[in-house]
Amino acid sequence: MPRRVLTGRVTSDKMDKTVTVLVDRRIIHPLYKKFIRKSKKYAAHDEANECREGDIVRIVECPPISKRKTWEVVWRNGHVLSTAHKEAIDAAATQIAHAEASGEAAAAAAEHQGA
């Protein structure tokens, strides 16, 4: 099973080798059918202390490092930090691109039917 990969923003880099990452996601409310933003904070391992507050990072699931830390930073502002998880990042990027392409295709089909 592939590891989960999330993209978020670093909100705190005050701990040694640990950053707090805020991951936003959008869901549809089941009753009102309105998009709602939900967010969650994850503690992620940053081996080289390279991440700073405000950086956009990708984190990947890993075996537990501590009680709260089960994620590792592998990508920061367009640069890969850990080559050990490169295949997980590539798989997630392919999955995201495929989802975006199918979403665009569905929007085009809906537009075509409406015209």
From Swiss-Prot:
<dbReference type="InterPro" id="IPR019984">
    <property type="entry name" value="Ribosomal_uS17_bact/chlr"/>
</dbReference>
<dbReference type="InterPro" id="IPR000266">
    <property type="entry name" value="Ribosomal_uS17"/>
</dbReference>
<keyword id="KW-0687">Ribonucleoprotein</keyword>
<dbReference type="GO" id="GO:0003735">
    <property type="term" value="F:structural constituent of ribosome"/>
</dbReference>
<comment type="function">
    <text>One of the primary rRNA binding proteins, it binds specifically to the 5'-end of 16S ribosomal RNA.</text>
</comment>
<dbReference type="GO" id="GO:0006412">
    <property type="term" value="P:translation"/>
</dbReference>
<comment type="similarity">
    <text>Belongs to the universal ribosomal protein uS17 family.</text>
</comment>
<dbReference type="Pfam" id="PF00366">
    <property type="entry name" value="Ribosomal_S17"/>
</dbReference>
<dbReference type="InterPro" id="IPR012340">
    <property type="entry name" value="NA-bd_OB-fold"/>
</dbReference>
<dbReference type="GO" id="GO:0022627">
    <property type="term" value="C:cytosolic small ribosomal subunit"/>
</dbReference>
<protein>
    <recommendedName>
        <fullName>Small ribosomal subunit protein uS17</fullName>
    </recommendedName>
</protein>
<keyword id="KW-0689">Ribosomal protein</keyword>
<keyword id="KW-0699">rRNA-binding</keyword>
<dbReference type="GO" id="GO:0019843">
    <property type="term" value="F:rRNA binding"/>
</dbReference>
<comment type="subunit">
    <text>Part of the 30S ribosomal subunit.</text>
</comment>
<keyword id="KW-0694">RNA-binding</keyword>
